Each structure stands twice: as C-alpha cells, then as structure tokens.
Regions:
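Terminal amphipathic alpha-helical/low-complexity segments used for targeting or macromolecular assembly
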Residues: 1-63, 69, 87, 93, ...
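Structural signal for interior beta-strand "rungs" in well-ordered beta-sheet cores
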Residues: 55-195
Length: 217
C-alpha cells in the first residue's frame, strides 16, 4: 500500500500522487491538485498518471498539468505550461515544455524534445527528435494523423496523414507562411496580405551630436 506522505515532498504544494493506480501499469498513479493550478484545474481535481514527482513540474507558478488518462513516466518531464490530455504518453527521457499540448493517442518516446508544439490524434515523436516553436515568427508545429518525427521540425509546419521526418532530416520554416506536409505531398498556405506591397519604412535618423560633447584628441 502506498502512503500519500511518502509520495509527495514537502516542497510540492501543487499536487499529490494518490493511491489510484493505473489499471494496466500499476506502477503509475493518478495525481490530485492541492491548489488551483489554472482556470481549468482547481484544488481537489484528479489528473492523469505519473510514475514520480520527477515527471511533472511543481514550481509555484507553473501551470503544466496532466489531464484525463494521459501518462508521464520513466525520466520524462513536463513543465512550463505544457499539458498532456486524452491518452497521450510521454516516456523514456522525453522533455515536454513551453506550452506544448499532446492529446489523443500521441506518444513522445526515447529522447524527444517538444517545445510549444501541438500533437493530436496518433502523432509520434521518437529517437532524438526535436519539435520546436519558432521564437521569432511565433510559428507553431502542429502534428496530427499518424505522422512520425525522428528528425527536427520547427516553425509553422503542419504534419498530417502518414508524413514521416526521418532521423537527420530537418523541416524548418522560418517564414510567415504555413508549410503543410501530408504523407509525401507538400504545399504552402499563404495569407493574402503577404502579396500586398507597402512603402519602405524610413530608417531612423541618427542622433544629433550636441555641442561641447565631442571628445578632444
């Protein structure tokens, strides 16, 4: 029998690991919020499953959460507002961060790193894959269908169907367009405003030198 006091460190005031074990994997247990975590998670709400506190951040201001029957186990770690929903699974040495959302039957395994991306349906990240949002363009990778990523995907990229990114391959979109990859087909979605012309913005004038401020030689 597991005791709650043995399942929570004194510094974790965000959630506790309950005695409710997973039906198939009894080494996993549901979490319960000890305080209001976000607008969606209130004190007393049950969450998904973890193996230990090492799977989900309990930093005071971190809204990262595991919902429904989702699982985080082994050395997988979820933090910085990322959430798992449905029956999503993150395991092995994966790192899910920066508001990433995994739902449906998605799976992140091996050494996958997912930052700010959205995965749904049966999308999978394996190997040393990296699926990253673009901090400059604010582009977010969106994966769905049965797509699988073993390489690197970044920016506004939509992978769907049976799209496959193999190990060593990089799909990078650092533009304002949306790159769509469905199976072996590739296309681009452009906003009509991208085709409009605008006058060049004048360069800022250099600051004027003030008298008496020049350095003597």
């Amino acid at each position: 029998m597991l005791h709650k006091k043995e399942m929570r460190t004194t510094s974790n005031q965000k959630y506790e690991i309950t005695e409710i074990s997973h039906e198939k994997y009894p080494f996993l247990h549901r979490i319960r919020a000890l305080r209001d975590v976000s607008a969606e998670v209130r004190a007393g709400d049950l969450g998904g499953f973890v193996e230990s506190e090492s799977n989900l951040s309990f930093e005071p201001d971190d809204t990262a959460w595991i919902f429904d029957d989702a699982i985080a186990c082994n050395d997988a770690y979820v933090d910085k507002g990322a959430v798992l929903r449905g029956e999503a699974v993150v395991c092995d040495n994966t790192y899910i961060s920066m508001g990433a959302v995994l739902s449906g039957h998605t799976r992140a395994e091996d050494n996958a790193y997912i930052r700010g991306a959205v995965l749904s349906a049966s999308a999978r990240a394996s190997g040393f894959s990296m699926i990253l949002n673009d901090k400059d363009t604010m582009g977010v990778p969106i994966l769905s269908g049965h797509c699988a990523v073993y390489g690197k995907v970044s920016g506004d990229v939509r992978l769907t169907g049976s799209a496959l990114v193999i190990s060593g391959e990089e799909i990078r979109n650092d533009t304002l367009d949306t790159l769509v990859i469905s199976g072996k087909n590739r296309s681009v979605i452009r906003d009509s405003s991208r085709d409009e012309l605008a006058p060049q913005q004048p360069a800022p004038s250099p600051p004027k030198k003030q008298k008496g401020c020049e350095m003597s030689r």
